Every structure is written in C-alpha cells, then in structure tokens.
C-alpha cells in the first residue's frame, strides 16, 4: 500500500531585487551605452555598482496558485495551460498593501515587457530593465509580474502572478532601474 504525507505541500516565495544606477556612471563604464540593446544594457548594468538597491519579498496570487492546481489535472486541456511571465507592472500605491486575492496592482501606472527570463528548475528569474527614457515622473513603490499584457486582464490567460511593495524609487531621465523578480518553488 502506498503511503502519502498529507502535510506536505509546495511553497512559493518571491524575492525582488531593485538596483538603481545613475545614467552617467553607466555611460562612463560603457561609452557605447546608447548603441546597446535593452538586453545588453541589462547585462552591462550588472557590472556597475548601483547607487541604490533594495530587496523585498512578495505574495504570490490566488490566480497563480489556481493555475498550478488546474494544470496538475490531467484532464485539463484549456489553452491557459501554457502561460509565461511576459510583463512587469509598476504602481504608486504601496500604502494599500498586498493580498493573495489581488488581480492587479493597487495603482498600476506603467507596464513593460520583461527583458529576460531564466530558470533552473526550481527558480524563475524575470529581469526587467527600465532605461533612462522609461517610466519617468513616477514614484514607483509596487510591482507585479503578469502572464501577458496587463491591458488585457479580461482575458483568462492574462493574470497577476505576484504583488510586492517596496521603498519608493523616483524615476527620472538620470536613472535606470533593474528589477529582478525571483520566484522560488520548494517543498514545505
């Protein structure tokens, strides 16, 4: 007879690392900065010490949990069975907090396609690079990953994956910001 551990489960943890760089420092380190692609700028910025950095942890959403449960069902043939991390949304209302029931950020004011995604089987790293021309004039203090363009949240395939709040970063044309979101899946 097979035995099962009824107390076992899976744990989701999200860690967000934010690094802010001064544009002048990046241009000094990489004189060809303006000619680099977004992916190359992300890689280059990792080689320069940031002027500010922060690490926070987040909640993963009920929608993500339901996605995993639904996709463990062998009878599930829905097209939603194959999603990816596509967009990062940024908002300006950390004061309202986060909840696993969230379906969007509290005050989403900016969204950007994820720049790079990598996984090692148990962790997914989604990195988004905001260039000096992007998201300016905002005091970002919340973020979330989306399974598609958040402008299409009425589509069942597009949902908020995680939601985090952090110390506000004022985005202007003198700064770049790198947001690394690591989702870790482990046994409890």
Can you say where each PLM-predicted feature lies in the sequence?
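Small cysteine-rich, disulfide-bonded extracellular modules of the LU/uPAR three-finger superfamily
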Residues: 1-141, 148-188
């Amino acid at each position: 007879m097979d035995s099962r551990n009824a107390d076992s489960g899976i744990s989701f943890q999200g860690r967000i690392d934010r690094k802010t760089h001064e544009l002048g420092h990046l241009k000094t380190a990489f004189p060809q900065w303006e000619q680099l692609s977004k992916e190359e700028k992300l890689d280059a910025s990792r080689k320069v010490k940031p002027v500010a950095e922060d690490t926070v942890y987040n909640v993963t959403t009920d929608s993500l949990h339901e996605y995993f449960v639904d996709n463990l069902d062998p009878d599930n043939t829905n097209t939603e069975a194959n999603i990816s991390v596509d967009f990062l949304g940024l908002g300006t209302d950390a004061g309202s907090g986060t909840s696993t029931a969230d379906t969007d950020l509290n005050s989403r004011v900016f969204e950007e396609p994820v720049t790079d995604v990598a996984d090692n089987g148990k962790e997914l790293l989604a990195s988004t690079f905001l260039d000096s021309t992007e998201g300016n004039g905002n005091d970002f203090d919340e973020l979330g990953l989306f399974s598609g363009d958040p402008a299409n949240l009425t589509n069942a395939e597009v949902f908020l994956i995680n939601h985090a709040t952090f110390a506000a970063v004022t985005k202007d044309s003198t700064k770049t910001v790198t947001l690394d979101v690591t989702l870790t899946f482990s046994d409890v």
